[in-house]
């Protein structure tokens, strides 16, 4: 497929594209076509709401959204930048959040990337088979540990 010229012009004007990964508005077919055409989202986030959170087999949290993009063929570092660094820059908070630089707010998540096959679905119930999953090990907010997996050691 091709990307609508109006969409490309919007990007040239500075419109930011977020894939809005939620149960009601993310389509795997459209995502695959966009990625194949070289049209990557600027920001990768969830568009999850309280009534849709933790509903398997949909991308029910950000680690699963990241895992879905791995299955779609995106490079891990590209995904992480779209989840951290790019949103921080777009919000005018570059160097303050979304980075591990000294002096930045220490909001940190540590994951274990595990080989595990599972299925995610989109709002049309189209499926993608994922072969890797990010499993949270530790979460820090403003430098304070908020969550630590019982078998994770600092």
Regions found by a protein language model. Give the residues of each.
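Active-site beta-loop-alpha junctions enriched in small/polar residues
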Residues: 20-24, 49-51
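Histidine/acidic residue-rich metal-binding segments in metalloenzymes
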Residues: 1-17, 25-42
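Short, surface-exposed, polar/charged, turn-prone segments marking secondary-structure boundaries
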Residues: 14, 44-48, 71-75, 132, ...
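His/Asp/Glu-enriched, well-ordered alpha-helical/loop segment
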Residues: 29-113
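Solvent-exposed alpha-helices and their adjacent loops that cap or buttress functional pockets
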Residues: 9-12, 101-102, 129-133
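C-terminal cap of metal-dependent C-N hydrolases
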Residues: 105-154
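C-terminal amphipathic alpha-helical segment
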Residues: 16-22, 70-71
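Short acidic-hydrophobic sequence patches enriched in Asp/Glu that either
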Residues: 2, 58-61, 131
